[in-house]
C-alpha cells in the first residue's frame, strides 16, 4: 500500500512552543490549514498534503525501498487507531492511491472526520514535548500513521515517547469510528517495513530470529525475553516457541495478543529491532509478520472425533427434518387419494354432464356387464346386507372375504357393499408383491395409498453412504432403511391421514362436539373410512414381511377405531397371519364359492339378454332373411326389455354349465363366446381344451427348474390322473399322503399345488379330508388329459421311472447293510441272522416290485412307439 506524505500544521498563536516546521512551504500550509494569511483562491488551489522534507529523493525513498530513512536526532512514532481496520480490505481494488483518498477527505464536506487531524491534535496541543515534525506517513492497512520527528540532543526519543503517552493517557483523543477507543503512540525501535501487500493485520505475530550480520548465527529468544519486550504493547494471551525438533529455519516464535490493534503496534514498532542477549556474542534481529491464527474449532473437532455419536445423531436430525417437512405433504396427498379430490369423475362438472347425457348416450358394454353382475348380486344380497351392517357397528375386528380366484370378491365389495361409501381406500397387494426390487415395491405401495412424494431411489444412495462410512469409520451410519422400515413409515403416515379423513365431517355444532377424537370415532363407525386390501397373501412365500406389516397395521387401525378393514383373499390359510396380528378375535368371514347351476345359468342368460343376437328367432346366421333383420331392428328400439332367448340355446346351456361349473370368470368367458356366435357346446369344449393345454404347459411340461418348485411333475400327474378317474371328482387326502409318489414332503407338495390352484383341499372339522380340482372346469380338463393316450403314456412313464428309481435306492440301501452285517455273521451268527433274513425278504419284495415296474414301463414304451 503506497503511503502519502502528510504535512502537520504548526500552531500560530503567540508564545506557542509546539512542533516547529522546517520549510517555508510548511508555514504556508499551516496558515492555510488555520485559514489565515492566504486569500480564498489560494487556499483552494494549494495542495492539501505535501511533504515537509526538503529533498525530493528522501520524500519518495520509502516508496521504493519500503523503509523510512531517519537522520541523526530523528526518530519515528507510530500512532494507532486512526483508521478503521476494515478500510484496507474494502478498498483493496480501489482505483485511487492513498494520497488521492486523503485529498478527497479534505476537499469534501466531511473533512472534520479526517484521521490526520487526530495526529495533529496529538502533537500540537502539548507544548511539553519540544519536537519538530518532519513527515507524517499514513498507513491505511494498519489503521495508523508514522510520524517522523526531530528532538533536542538533551532529550532522548524514549523520553519523548513517555511524555507523549502520558499526555495521551490524561487527555485521550477518540476517533470518530470508535468512540470507546483512543489514539495510542509508540516509539519505533526497529526498522518498519512499509509494504503494500495484501496482508491484513492479525492478532498473532510471528517473530523470526535472524542474524544481524550475514556471517553470524542468531540466538533464539526465550519466552521470558519475548514477554518483556512485547508486553508494553498490550496484553498477551500466549507465547508459543518453535518445537525443538523442528528443522524450519529461521527459528521463530508466535505471540498472540488479545487485540489486533496491539499486534499492529508491536509489529510496526519492533520490526527490524536488533538486540543482544546476555552472554551471547552475536546480535539477533527480530523480523515480525502477521500470522493467521488457526482456530481451535472445538465443536468440529469433537464431531470428527466421535463418529459413533455424531453419525447416528445426524441421521436422526435428517429424519426429523424429513418428517417435519414432507410428512404433512404426504398426509395431504393420502387424504386426497382417499377422498378423491383430484379425480375428474368426482367433480361436479362430470356428474352434471353424466346426468344430462345418461338418457342420450348408451354405454352398451357397461350395460351388459351390469346386467350380469346384478343377477349375481341379487343372488348374494344377503351377504351384501350382512357386510354393510357390520360396517355400521363398532367392532374391532376384520372382515375377510375368502373365495377362489374369479369368484367376484372385488366386484361384490367395491361395486355393491361400498357403492354408497365415499371414503374408500383400495390397496391391491398383487402389484406391490410382484414389483422388482425394494425401490419398486416401495413405489407401488406408495402409489396404492397415494403416498407422495416418495424418493424410493434415495435408499440406494443412502446404502452407498452407509457402506462408505462403515468402511472408513467402522460404524454403520444407518442412513439407509430396510424394506420393512420403509413399509412401516408409509403405513403410519397413511394411518394418520385416515384418522383425519374420519374426523373431516365433524362440526362444532354437533351434539357430541365435546368428545375426544378417539371417542368420536368410536361413537360414529359410519364416519370411518373403509380399507379394502385385495389379493392378500398373493405370493406370500416371496415377500411375507409385507403381509405381516400390513396385517399389523390393519389390526392397529381397527383397534384404534380409525377405519374398517376388509381383506379379499383366495388363500385358505389367511387366518394364520391375521391371528398373529389380532389374537383373541373372531373374524367376520364371508366365503364365496362357485355358483350353483341354476344361478350360473341365470347369470349367463342375463349377460345374453342385452344382446339382440339372441332374440326369439334363435342365433343369427349369414343366410337369415331380411324380415328377420327387420324384427331384430324393432327389438333394438326397446332396450330396457330383455330379449327372449332361443329355447334350443337354453337346453344346451343346461348340459354345458354342468360341465363348466359355476366359477364366475369361466361363466363370463362362456358368455363372451356365445355373443360372437358360438354354440354353447362348442364354446364349452374350447374352454376345456384351452384349460387342458394350460395345465399341460404349466404343470406337466414346464421347463422351469425343479428347485424353483416344491412339487414334481410326477406328483402333479398323479393327482390329475386319479381325480379324472374318480367318480366323485375327489380323492381322499390321506391316500395321497400314503402313496409312493408323495413319499417325500407330501404336505409341502400339496400346499404348493393348492397355491398354484391346480387342486383344492377340502377340510372337515379343521382337518384336510379330500382333494378336488382347483375349479370345476379343471375336472373336465383332467379327464381330457387322462383320455389322451400320448399324454397319459408319457406321464405314466415318468411316474414308473420315478417309482423304479425309488425301489432301486431301497434295494441299494439293503445291500449296503448286508455288506456291513457280513463280518458279524462269522462271529455271532445268532444275533444277526434274523436281521439278515428280514433284509433278504425286503430285497426280494423290492426286486419283485422293480421287475413289475419295468414290465409296465415296457408296455408304456410300446404304446408310445405305436402312438
Curated annotation (Swiss-Prot):
Tagged with keyword Transferase: no
InterPro entries, sorted: Mt_escape_2_C, Nucleotide-bd_a/b_plait_sf, P-loop_NTPase, RBD_domain_sf, RRM_dom, Yme2_C, Yme2_RRM
Mitochondrial intermembrane side: 330-867
Xref: Gene3D superfamilies: 3.30.70.330, P-loop containing nucleotide triphosphate hydrolases (3.40.50.300)
Keyword presence, Transmembrane helix: yes
Residue range of the transit peptide in the UniProt record, numbered on this chain: 1-41
Keywords: Coiled coil, Membrane, Mitochondrion, Mitochondrion inner membrane, mRNA processing, RNA-binding, Transit peptide, Transmembrane, Transmembrane helix
Protein name, entry field: Mitochondrial escape protein 2
Gene that this sequence comes from: msp-45
